[in-house]
């Protein structure tokens, strides 16, 4: 089920010099529904509204990512989005995004902005060794006709690969809360290994998600916090494959 909340457009006299670009956030939720209120508080300062897909009625291990994204992209376009911000309930943007959003969305043409994807291993520290220090999430992009998107893989981009999108980096941080709890790291590894046993969608596989060999952490800089602060509940936030094994 799709729900949305779109802020009223500014009066025309306030946008005579330059029309404000409308940024609509899109996300879906299921096992992480309880994280949505804090997500909305996090993104409210820099979006013009949001569209959400309530996936809690699903019964399988993992519902159709392609189908959910198609619905969200179309709903955002119908809501008048110039730009789309794709996010998950367990992600938080640094507060500086609010001051930078206007400049980011001023760029012409098809652009996908990449954020430094910081995998938190504690509420205030993220991992930086190896692959962990170089992750980029291109999640702010120009709105487009969802019919252009034909990708079907588990980890596909939100925007079409061969449609002229320029991938740029904004240097801002996007913090991922899911990896804070060690149990979730293992559960995430197991879930993706179950969904992609032949590694067709990710050649390196998923064991690295729970491998702490050589772990190096870096504290979130004092001038780059996210808001609101996160208090971890220790929940799994995803399908528990142990339940599936028990039922079998």
Question: Where does each model-flagged region fall?
Answer:
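Catalytic-site signature of metal-activated, phosphate-bearing donor transferases
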Residues: 2-8, 70, 95-248
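A short, glycine-/small-residue-rich helix N-cap motif at loop->alpha-helix starts
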Residues: 59-69
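A short beta-strand-loop structural module common to alpha/beta enzyme folds
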Residues: 49-58
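Cell-envelope/extracellular polymer assembly enzymes that use nucleotide-activated donors
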Residues: 22-24
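Short, well-formed alpha-helical segments that are part of the catalytic scaffolds
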Residues: 6-15, 31-45, 52
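Short beta-strand-to-loop acidic/aromatic patch adjacent to the donor-nucleotide binding site
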Residues: 81-94
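Active-site nucleotide-sugar/metal-binding loop of Leloir-type enzymes
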Residues: 70-83
